[in-house]
């Protein structure tokens, strides 16, 4: 089973927000998550990103793969994902 850290879309039509979750790589986008690590509010005046960094480091050390979008969000918000990879 391959595990990924990726975004899960939530919210109403045309008002999305995203949860950063750990999921099986074959699960659908809005499927059941193993664990929720944080959220990303796109519509807010200031894009809000909140992540449980200790849990993310733990999942990366267990072999979880970051999606391209999550990597981009971490880089954009000065949270270096490469330093967390083992």
UniProtKB/Swiss-Prot annotation:
It comes from the Bacteria. It holds the Pfam family Ribosomal_S16. Keywords: Ribonucleoprotein, Ribosomal protein. PROSITE patterns: RIBOSOMAL_S16. InterPro entries: Ribosomal_bS16 (IPR000307), Ribosomal_bS16_CS (IPR020592), Ribosomal_bS16_dom_sf (IPR023803). SUPFAM superfamilies: Ribosomal protein S16 (SSF54565). The keyword Ribonucleoprotein applies. GO terms for molecular function: structural constituent of ribosome. One of its GO terms (biological process) is translation. GO terms for cellular component: cytoplasm; small ribosomal subunit. The keyword Transmembrane helix does not apply. HAMAP family: Ribosomal_bS16. Belongs to the bacterial ribosomal protein bS16 family. This is Small ribosomal subunit protein bS16. It comes from Borreliella afzelii (strain PKo) (Borrelia afzelii). The gene is rpsP.
